[in-house]
Amino acid sequence: MPVLHNRVSNQELRARMLAESEPRTTVSFYRYFTLSDPQGFRDDLYRTLTALQVFGRVYIAAEGINAQISVLQSRFDAMREALYAAHPQLDGLRLNVALDDDGKSFWVLRMKVRPRIVADGIDDPTFNPANVGHYLKAEEVNALADDPQALFVDMRNHYEYEVGHFDQAIEIPSDTFREQLPMVVEMLQHDKDKKIVMYCTGGIRCEKASAWMRHNGFKNVYHVEGGIIEYARRAREQGLPLKFTGKNFVFDERLGERITPDIIAHCHQCGAPCDSHTNCRNQGCHLLFIQCPVCAEHYVGCCSVTCQEELSLPLSEQRSHRAGRENGMKIFNKSRERLQLSLTGEDSAQK
């Protein structure tokens, strides 16, 4: 029986991917549907995608599938047909092909079974996730963008909103979708008669959010079909003006797709115009933040003087510094105060 998980080091896998001569295509997709045996479905699909040399991140739950993958261009059609055949509910699945792609987005296939394909924190047995809002195509999005009675609501995290968003969209200031759902209901409680247009990267979050809004008494709820990725593609194909400004953050090695030339964010260290996310080079920190080329050189890719100094230590000393440190993804919003302190070296005692 084949091993149904990766057993090769990330370093070696990344080197193999970078050595490939054939270009890859980055694709994202999701679908809400009922799976009676998520683990069995996961294992079967893992075998199929591994045979096709597909890399990426795939989450499977009883409520469906959520995936971001990369595939060799010569195997794209075979991958698509394999997905369509994997389950009757996946036949005709929409595949969001990346807009700004160097083919280096993933180098390993990771597939996990989870309680939900997107963590929503909803624990209400009366909630019907199928009762979604109206899907909007690109031309309909633009029409509503010019409608003073329409409110565009960004259902992405703050660091995604920071580098790009629909014009005049409302930010739900949080780091997680789970936190945003109760927040958006509260923030818009006096706007139930308005047209609520929800959007996200590829559609998975705003689709569920639209059902949640309807569950909470909002009547005129819409969501952008296929998210920002599909909207931008269709708008360009149809010659429509883009109502989204800046960059679309993505959760892979690219960390962003350029939608318009506008740079609306700023370096988190010096304040210069910049929308390039990076992770702190200090592996004991790995903070996600925006850093301009000047600061990248000055801080050697680190988020702070403290991390820069720690990175210069022998590996054994770096490991001792990391011991007991909080694990998990760190992003600038949660670490703003620490970052400001560490830029001046004042948080050394905390490290």
UniProtKB/Swiss-Prot annotation:
This is tRNA uridine(34) hydroxylase. It comes from Sodalis glossinidius (strain morsitans). InterPro entries: Rhodanese-like_dom, Rhodanese-like_dom_sf, Rhodanese_C, TrhO, TRHO_N. HAMAP family: TrhO. It comes from the Bacteria. GO terms for molecular function: oxidoreductase activity, acting on paired donors, with incorporation or reduction of molecular oxygen. GO terms for biological process: tRNA modification. Transmembrane segments: none annotated. Keywords: Oxidoreductase, tRNA processing. The keyword Ligase does not apply. CDD domains: RHOD_YceA. Its EC number is 1.14.-.-. Residues 146-240 form the Rhodanese domain.
